[in-house]
Amino acid sequence: MALLGDIVIYIIMAFVVIGAVAAIRDDERGMGKEFLEGLHSIGPIFIPVAGIMASIPYLSRFIEWAIGPIFGLIGASPAMAGTTIIAVDMGGYQLAQATAGDTANWIMAAIVGYMAGATIVFSIPVGLAMLDRRDHKYMALGIMSGILTVPIGVLITTSILSITGANVRDEVSTTADSTFSMSALGFGTILTNLIPLVIIVVAIALGLYFYADAMIKGFMGFGKIMDTGIKLVLAFSIVEYFTGFFSTVLGGWGFDPIIADAQDQFRALEIAGYIGIVLAGAFPMVYAIRTYLARPLSVVGRRVGMSVEGSAGVLAAAANILALYHLVRTIPPKDKVLCIAFAVCSAFLLGDHLAFTANFQPNMILPLMLGKLGAGLIAMVVAAWIAVPKALELERQDREQGVIGVDEYLAVGGLGAGQQESVEELAVGEQKGTDNPDSDPQRSGR
């Protein structure tokens, strides 16, 4: 496991150098552009990381008092509650250690944070901010479909760690020896810890199947509230850091610092920075794969019923969900849902999460990659069954209302035969002089 981690890191570091040289020659295209975008991603990553990590003292109390006891009644570790909603690289790793009670449960809780937590605190608020409003409903369908396979991804990764007896670090460190054997994590503990997650995903599945419209509205409301809270906490933390205003006026400040201090060397700014400097190599690496393997990727995409844009979206998500969000507008609605469903568990596979794991738990790289990838692929199958029919219905409505242009996405194979015929009928109607000003493609967008 350690050897694989070293190999991956050295490959990424080679692309850091290649990307830097390319940026010197031309920083507006190719690997040079990808190198700089990796570094520039530190900012977007820092916003939610800082907001969540600063809130950890209050989130910890909320989890310990409100959610943890519910998990405990089932027999699951309270640490699982925290990483269900907080990403591992946004404070979930440290929070899980503080609430787990032992290393085995800490590591399992951290794995949940790579999938469920990353989605709740990062992918959702950032997606709502980056995507066109017309794409929010497709994002909701994709997210809710992808959440259903989180227990599968956690089961795959923890099973590999347990069976192989992989050694992990038993403290938050980038330099400590890996001395704790994960063979201590038994299958009984794994299954017990997964019970709350299974209950949550079953509830989501039932809601998505029977009340899709209400679930979409609830999802978007939740994301907006979270995004607002994160930005306010970050703003207040910045004011407090430079002025001490809140400590002076209120007599105390319960939030954690967002910049390293004597108490903790891995605060929000440092973690975002660690991730960004690794992405400076990961992004050029993915660019090379996407460029030089474009033909086989398109062949694979066609065989599974996806457009070339959709196939590129899947690969982009594997590096960083920001890269996927950048492409979403060009991807047909059906493939938007499939890509985002894949991204719930598999996003950051070759980017942020690879970087974080390589820094803090290098022996977990292979089991984590297999778990995330397996769950992501299964999520696409689930989404095709439970969410794509609704997505096609919404696409038809968007076309009729002019939100999506009549010819938009047709060139990339986003429609089935039935939708193709319907769109042709709309186009014929327009050619005959149908008075429908809302069908103007120029009016689509936010």
Task: Go through the PLM ranges and name each one.
Residues 1-51, 108-113, 123-281, 358, ...:
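Signature of multi-pass transmembrane helix bundles
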Residues 63-84, 259-268:
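Alpha-helical transmembrane-segment detector that highlights a single hydrophobic TM helix
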Residues 27-31, 63, 289-296:
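Juxtamembrane/interfacial segments flanking transmembrane helices
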Residues 74-149, 307-361:
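Alpha-helical membrane segments and immediately flanking helix-loop junctions
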Residues 247-309, 313-322:
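Long, well-ordered mid-to-C-terminal structural blocks that present hydrophobic/aromatic surfaces
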Residues 33-41, 68-73, 224, 295-306:
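Short amphipathic alpha-helical coupling elements at transmembrane boundaries
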Residues 55-65, 95-103, 160-163:
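Transmembrane alpha-helix boundary signature
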